[in-house]
Amino acid sequence: MLISRQERARICSDSELGAGNLLARLKAYGRPLDEPVLRTDGTWRAPDGSRPEVLTLGELYAVVEAYAGWYAAHGVRPRDPVALHSSSSAEFAVNFLALTSLGAIPSFVNGNLAPETAREYVRRQGAVGAFTDESHREVLTDAGLGFHVTADAIRPEHRASLPASYPYRHDPTDPVLISHSSGTTGMPKGVPHTHRTLMYAQVHRLRYSTGTDMERTLVGLPGAHNAMVATLLYCLLLRTDIKLLSSQRGADVLDTVEEFRPTTVLAFAGTFGEMAAEDLTRRDLSSVQVWFNTGDAAHEAHIRALVAHGSHQKVDRDLRRVRVDGSVFVDGLGSSEAGYSVFHNRHTKDTDAYARRIGKPISFAEAAVLSEDGIPLPPGQIGRLGLKSPTLTPGYWNDSLTWNRMRLGGYWLTGDLAHQDEDGNFYHLDRAPDAVRTRAGIVFSTRTEELLLAELPELADCTVVGVAPDGVRADWDGDGEGEAYALLQVTDEGAADAADAAGGDEAWTERVNSVLTAAGYPPVHRALRMKPDDVAKGATGKVLKRVMRDRFAAEEQHA
C-alpha cells in the first residue's frame, strides 16, 4: 500500500527529514509497526540469530537500535567514519540506518574490491573501526582499527547501550555516508553525501511522481553503492514492497524477478546487459512495468531486449489510463558523485531515442558540454560533460586535490565526453580515458560499442579498447596515436564457429569495419572474439578498460 496524498504532503513539507534520520521521521509520522517494510535475500544474520527474509517496521527499529547500541558501547560517536566491508546488501542497509542514527558516518567498501585495495581504501578514510561479513573478516583484521565486528557479535540486548541523546539530530550539511567510485581508473575515490544531498532527489520524486510503478521494487544495485541507499530511502517513504538482492549477476536477478514478481527492477547497465544476453523467452517477466538503470547509460540492444517483455500503463487519446504490452526502460546516467541520475531517457518498444542519447537534465540540475577552458559549447561540438546539482557530493573524502581538479567553469566534470543537439538533448559518447586517438580519427569506444551491438545481432556484448606504444598517450587528453580493438562476445557459438571457419578474426574485423565505415565512424585495427570470463570487471560490474588495455598490450607485445 503506497502512501496517501496526505502522507505525501506531510513528508514533502517536513523540514527535519533527511537521509540520516529517516526511521525517526517514520516514527513521527505514526507508521504502523507491524507493516512489512524490507525484504532480504537471506544473506544477513539478525541479532537474534535468525536470517529473516522480511522485516516489519517494528522489527527494523529493533534491529537498528541493537546495532546502534553495540556501536555506541564500543565508542562510536558522531562524525566517526566506520568501514563496512561485505557482500550482503541487507548488511549495508541495516548498518547505514544504525550508524546514521548515532550521527556516525558509514563508509561502504564493496565486497568485490581486491583485498589490498580495500585495506588501503579504508586506511585513507580514517575509519575508527569496521564491520565485515565472515568472508571479508581477514581483509581488515590487521588494518589497525579500533574494533572489528561481524553480525554474530551483535545481540538484541545491545539496545540497552543506546546513548541518552539517541537519535542524533542532523544538520543538513552533516555527512551521512561515504561510498566509493567504481575504481575503473585506479584507487576508488571516497564519495561522501550529506543529510541533504542524499535525500534531495527522493523528496523531489515524491512531489512530482506518484510512484505507482514501484509498488513492488527489486533492487539489484550493489549494496555498497549510494544508489542502493537512495532507493531504500525512497521506498521506505513511499511504503513500497522492496527487496534487496546482494547479487548483480543477470541470471540471479532474472531468477528473483520470477520469484518476487516486482513491478520495478533497478540495476546497473552491466547487469541489464547480462540479462539481455539470456534467452528471455524462457523467463516470466510479465510483472515488470519499469526497468530503471543508473550509473552508465545502457546500450540500445540491451534495452530493446528487455522492453519487449512486461507491460505498462499509458494515457490514450481519451485521457484514459490503459495497459499496453511492453515495459518501460528508464535509462539514467549518474554516478556516485552526482548522488542521483541527473539524466533520464525513457524507452519503450515503440520509441527510438537511441544513438547514445541521454536526454535532458532533471529539472533541479544543470548540465553543459564544456570546452577545455570551461566555456559551454554550442550544439554539435564535442566536449566535457559538466554538472551542477543540489544532489552533488561536497567533495572527495580526504582528497580535496582530486576534487578540485575535476571542477571546471563552476561545473563538476563527470569524466564523460558528450555533445548536444539543437533541441537541448545530450548525447554520451565515451569516458575521456577510453576514447582512442587513431590515424583514422578518434574512436569513441562506447559509441562504437553501441553501434556494433545494434547492427550485429550475433553479439551479446562487446568492448572497444585502445592500445598505444609505450610512453604514448592516445586518449582524449593525449596527443599520440594508438590502435583500437573490438573485443566481441557472441550469443550463438555455432554461428560464431562457422564465421571463424570462414575467415576467423579477419572475417570479424571486416564485418565490424563495414558497419563502422557505413556510419562514418573510424575503423578498428582488429576485431577479436573473447569469452565473458575474459572481460575484466570492477567492483560494481563495470568493464575495466584500463586493465583490458594493459592486458591486451602485453599480449600483443609477446605475440
From Swiss-Prot:
Gene3D superfamilies: N-terminal domain of ligase-like
Keyword Signal listed: no
CDD domains listed in its UniProt record: AFD_class_I
Transmembrane parts of this sequence: none
Top-rank lineage group of the source organism: Bacteria
Name listed for the protein in its UniProt record: 3-aminoavenalumate diazotase
Family that this chain belongs to: Belongs to the ATP-dependent AMP-binding enzyme family.
Keyword Ubl conjugation: no
InterPro entries, per the entry: AMP-binding_CS, AMP-dep_synth/lig_dom, ANL_N_sf
MF annotations from Gene Ontology: ATP binding; CoA-ligase activity; metal ion binding
Residues holding Mg(2+): S181, E337
Enzyme class: ligase
